[in-house]
Swiss-Prot record:
Key word Ligase present: no
Role noted for this protein: Responsible for the release of ribosomes from messenger RNA at the termination of protein biosynthesis. May increase the efficiency of translation by recycling ribosomes from one round of translation to another.
Family designation: Belongs to the RRF family.
Any one Gene Ontology BP term: translation
Gene: frr
Entry keyword set: Acetylation, Cytoplasm, Protein biosynthesis
Subcellular location per the Swiss-Prot or TrEMBL entry: Cytoplasm
Chief location of this protein within or outside the cell: cytoplasm
CDD domains reported in the protein's UniProt record: RRF (cd00520)
Gene Ontology MF: a single term: ribosomal large subunit binding
InterPro entries, A to Z: Ribosome_recyc_fac, Ribosome_recyc_fac_dom, RRF_sf
Name this protein carries in UniProt: Ribosome-recycling factor
Lineage: Bacteria, Pseudomonadati, Pseudomonadota, Gammaproteobacteria, Enterobacterales
Length: 185
């Protein structure tokens, strides 16, 4: 019983950490990354389709992404979708390829992005703490029903706290990496 609760808490905390890492990977840092365009959806014959399914996105150099659209007739729609996104990017068409130069970030924009990343980190920490609370509540219910001893309850709470500390440490490490990446020129 307790081991199931612990495993469930561990899995849910890992999901919180991964969701945070995925969320901050979408935040532009001034360095080209194909994941920057992951959230872009293109209208493909009347159906909203993720860009990844319509084209390959590669890094041409540190400030340029290269998009190779599989169906050339979709190039204008892909360009339009990138311009319509809130990323502030202006794609250039060059034959079958689309190049997306990434403008350098201003100091003010870097600070704004840092605040956004810190907010995301706080939400991730809160999610991890909620998982801890849920796990501890389940253990308390077992204690109340006399299914486990007080020693087991205390041991379980300590285990869950260690999991929480580890998950928050991972979040802090990812936050520090992203902040350092944002502040590089």
């Amino acid at each position: 019983m307790i081991s199931d609760i612990r495993k469930d808490a561990e899995v849910r905390m890992d999901k919180c950490v991964e969701a945070f890492k995925t969320q901050i990977s979408k935040i532009r840092t001034g360095r080209a990354s194909p994941s920057l365009l992951d959230g872009i959806v293109v209208e493909y014959y009347g159906t909203p389709t993720p860009l990844r399914q319509l084209a390959s996105v590669t890094v041409e150099d540190s400030r340029t992404l290269k998009i190779n659209v599989f169906d050339r007739s979709m190039s204008p729609a892909v360009e339009k979708a990138i311009m319509a996104s809130d990323l502030g990017l202006n794609p250039n068409s060059a034959g079958s390829d689309i190049r997306v130069p990434l403008p350098p970030l201003t100091e003010e924009r870097r600070k704004d992005l840092t605040k956004i990343v810190r907010g995301e980190a706080e939400q991730a920490r809160v999610a991890v703490r909620n998982v801890r609370r849920d796990a501890n509540d389940k253990v308390k219910a077992l204690l109340k029903d006399k299914e486990i001893s007080e020693d087991d309850d205390r041991r379980s709470q300590d285990d869950v706290q260690k999991l929480t500390d580890a998950a928050i440490k991972k979040i802090e490490a990812a936050l520090a990496d992203k902040e350092a990446e944002l502040m590089q020129f």
